[in-house]
Amino acid sequence: MKILKPYMRNTSILYYLCFLLNSHFLTEAGIHVFILGCVSVGLPKTEANWIDVRYDLEKIESLIQFIHIDTTLYTDSDFHPSCKVTAMNCFLLELQVILHEYSNMTLNETVRNVLYLANSTLSSNKNVIESGCKECEELEERNFTEFLQSFIHIVQMFINTS
């Protein structure tokens, strides 16, 4: 199972550092190192999670062979590279439909992980304004298999540019 918060992987190292510096708290330098160490625990890492997103999407692809998903989702199959953030936001909104319509625990857990990883990685691009892009509702509705193929394609574009 994937870690839902991959940027928290190395926090235990900082805790050990804090305990190590415990004997040096009486010095001003020790206090500064301790405070900076504690502050850095809350800062997210900037590493891209797109490879993990692609892995989870491929896992969903294998899961749907055993689960009958009869839904159509707005799918941007021919998006322009200058609209990739807008297209990704549409894919993420549509993926939430699966959470609401299907109750398979493994599927929902994987979908939640995709949403979390993609949103946390995309958060730095949330305020990007891309002009001339289609709204989500203007996109063509496709079945879930085609939706996943297009989703994997756009994630691959993010991997190639990071």
UniProtKB/Swiss-Prot annotation:
Q: Which residues form the propeptide?
A: 30-48
Cysteines engaged in disulfide bonds, as pairs: C83-C133, C90-C136
Please classify the protein's predominant subcellular localization into one broad category.
Answer: secreted
Provide GO CC annotations from the record.
Answer: cell surface; cytoplasm; extracellular space
Disulfide bond in keyword set: yes
Q: Report the superkingdom from the record.
A: Eukaryota
Q: Signal among the record's keywords? A: yes
InterPro entries xrefs: 4_helix_cytokine-like_core (IPR009079), IL-15 (IPR020439), IL-15/IL-21_fam (IPR003443), IL-15_mml (IPR020466)
Keywords recorded for this protein, A-Z: Cytokine, Disulfide bond, Glycoprotein, Secreted, Signal
Coiled-coil region: none
Question: Signal peptide location in the record?
Answer: 1-29
> What subcellular locations does the record give?
Secreted
Pfam families referenced in this protein's UniProt entry, alphabetically: IL15
The family this protein is said to belong to: Belongs to the IL-15/IL-21 family.
Report the protein's function. Answer: Cytokine that stimulates the proliferation of T-lymphocytes. Stimulation by IL15 requires interaction of IL15 with components of the IL2 receptor, including IL2RB and probably IL2RG but not IL2RA. In neutrophils, stimulates phagocytosis probably by signaling through the IL15 receptor, composed of the subunits IL15RA, IL2RB and IL2RG, which results in kinase SYK activation.
The identity of this protein, by name, is: Interleukin-15
Lineage of source species: Eukaryota, Metazoa, Chordata, Craniata, Vertebrata
